[in-house]
């Protein structure tokens, strides 16, 4: 008796594998017909953890009009997120990078989300290239172009 169990990948894992909804690594002989999926990466054995974080953080980011396209975890515990805007009325999707350490990762990502959702007077959101959230009391923001100085009357 032979049993066949269908596997539906939910994410790309590293360069040549896929992940099941449970975070199991799948090696597929032919994957040309698969739709574009999030790209996840991390040390061997970390696939379930990376997938869990992806789901958690993508849901948080979706709440402010952002989508998590790719997530990777380094061996030393740094998380790199590739994020894009999907806000209605935006001229185009804008990708940018977020970096956060394992230490207080949820708190620091939450701090970014609060700032992002509350403040766009200077149009800075459209200029984000990279944000480093590894600082205990703030974040470093790299912009594509410098903002124009605000003038007060």
Indicate residue ranges for each PLM-predicted region.
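Charged, solvent-exposed interaction patches on well-folded alpha/beta domains
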Residues: 1-153
């Amino acid at each position: 008796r032979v049993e066949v169990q269908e596997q539906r990948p939910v994410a790309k894992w590293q360069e040549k594998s896929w992940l099941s909804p449970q975070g199991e690594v799948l090696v597929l002989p032919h994957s040309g017909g698969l739709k574009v999926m999030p790209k996840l990466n991390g040390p061997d054995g970390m696939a379930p953890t990376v997938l869990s974080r992806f789901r958690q953080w993508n849901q948080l980011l979706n709440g402010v009009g952002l989508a998590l396209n790719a997530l990777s975890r380094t061996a030393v515990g740094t998380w790199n997120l590739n994020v894009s805007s999907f806000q209605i009325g935006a001229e185009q999707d804008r990708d940018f990078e977020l970096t956060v350490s394992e230490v207080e990762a949820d708190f620091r990502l939450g701090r970014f989300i609060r700032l992002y959702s509350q403040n766009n007077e200077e149009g800075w959101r459209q200029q984000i290239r990279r944000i480093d959230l590894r600082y205990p009391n703030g974040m470093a923001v790299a912009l594509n172009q410098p903002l124009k100085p605000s003038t007060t009357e």
